[in-house]
C-alpha cells in the first residue's frame, strides 16, 4: 500500500490559512504575526500613556511645559497550542479529503482556545458598567464610558443567553422590526454591531479590536510520525502566541446587577 504521508509544507499552508482566517473573521482583536519568541519565553508588553498640553507661543518663546510619557509593562509567557490527529492509509483510500477535514477541525479547536484566551484578557478590563437589566440603555451607557469621538470601530459582544434580553427590549424592537438578522449577529444598537457568542456567560463587552492583541508566530509548525507496521500517520500542528489586553481604554465590561 502506498505511503500517504503528506508534505509538511502542504499541511502547514492549509493550517496557517485556516487559523489566520478564522481568528480574523471574529474581528475581536488585533492580530500581529510578528512574534519571534519561542514557547516558554517571556515578552514584555508596555501600555503607554502620553500627557501634554499644546500651547500657543509667540515669536521667540518656547513651551512652558513639556509633554511626558509613562508606561506600565507586563510580562507574558509565550504559549504553545497544539493539536494532534491520526489517520491510517486505509482511511485515506476511503476518503481522500480526510486530512483536509482533520486539519480544518484541528485549527478550529486551536481557534477556540485562542478565543478562550481572548475572553480571559477581556475580563481584565478596568472600566465597567453595571446595569439593572441588559438592553438598549445598558449598551448606550457602556458606549459612553468608552468615550470615543469616532465610534465606527466599536462593537459589542454578549453571551448567547442575553440575546433574548435585547430582542425583547422595546427600543430595540422599534428600531429593528422587520429586518432580517444574519450569521449570529443580533443586529445593531446605535449603529454598533452586537454579536452573540457562547464564549461568554455572565458579562458583555463594548470594545474595539485594539483593546486585545493576539501576538502569533507567522509560521505554523507541523510535525509528522508514521508507524509503517500499522500504516498509521500522526500529524501535530503547533502555534506559538500571546493574547494580551493591550489598550484598556478601548474596552468596557458590562454586567447585570445581582
Could you say what each language-model-derived stretch is?
Residues 53-56, 95, 165-167, 244-246:
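Short helix/loop capping segments that flank catalytic or ligand/cofactor-binding pockets
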Residues 43, 137-229:
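Extended oligomerization regions of viral-like shell subunits
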Residues 70-79:
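Short glycine/proline-enriched loop/turn "hinge" motifs that connect secondary-structure elements
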Residues 1-71, 213-223, 228-230, 234, ...:
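N-terminal "assembly arms/tails" that initiate or stabilize quaternary assembly
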Residues 89, 158-160, 239:
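Short, structured patches in soluble enzyme cores that scaffold and shape functional sites
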